[in-house]
Amino acid sequence: MKNVYLTQFSTVTLGTYYFFPYSTGLLWAYAQLNDTIKSTYSLKRFFYRKDHINTIVESLDNPAVFGLSAYVWNINYNLELAKAVKRAYPNCLLLMGGPGVPDKDTMYLKNYPFIDYCIHKEGELAFTELLLGTDPYTIPGLSFLDKDGNTHYSTANSRIKKIDDIPSPYLIGLFDDIVKEAKELGIIVNGITETNRGCPYKCTFCDWGGVVFSKVFNFDSQRVYDEITWMAHNEIELISLADANFGIFVDR
């Protein structure tokens, strides 16, 4: 089996409050729908708490894939960690996604050549195709350096219209070990979930909206209820909604 590690480092308050790695959990949950991936790759762990970079690198067991979810509060740390992982494991497929990755910066990958692929916007489809070894030139939503060292941008992402096809990482048990770890360490891990994706507006301060994400798709209400029930059962103190525009649908 090929080993996979996924990171989504939280903002930290007093060193005790963290968040579940919801975005990377969705990536892995969706990839598990593919039998080839299930039989080829093994998720070793999620990293959600920052540590000394050398400590994280030394904890890795021959990683085949190392994925990082980038936000404004962790991008610099992510880049240093990515560089260290690539130095220690040059054959590891190193992926970077999230709103911290610029969409149209032709110098980004030239400045950080240790990143193999940047995944833009929705990541579930592109992540799955990369694990399957699909020709990257045919995968929407990617940027990477071609053989001449130039940045190649794929076509815009194809969105997942039936978003309930993405299994809930909470409900399929991906975060059960984190709940156990949090209790052992005496830390608080807070929940993140979505009731919908997309937004019809184009606010300049927001990563949502625009042409690609103007259509809003709803998660089934029962799924959202079941996730909240899971969090209540596991004594999660705070739940954050990752919707671009919560409450846009009056009937929900």
Descriptions of predicted regions:
Residues Y5-Q8, R45-F47, G67-V72, M96-G97, ...:
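Short beta-strand segments
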Residues V4, V12, P136, L145-I192:
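N-terminal [4Fe-4S]-dependent radical SAM core
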Residues W28, L79-A82, G191, I228:
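Generic structural signal for well-ordered alpha-helices
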Residues Y30, W73, Y108, T128, ...:
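Tryptophan-centric aromatic hotspots in well-structured domains and transmembrane helices
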Residues S23, Y170-R252:
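Radical SAM [4Fe-4S] cluster-binding motif and immediate context
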Residues Y30-L33, S39-I160:
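Glycine-rich beta-alpha loop elements in corrinoid/cobalamin-binding modules
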Residues M1-K2, D61-P63, N91, I139, ...:
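A general structural motif
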Residues T13-T24:
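Glycine- and acidic-residue-enriched helix-capping/strand-helix junction motifs
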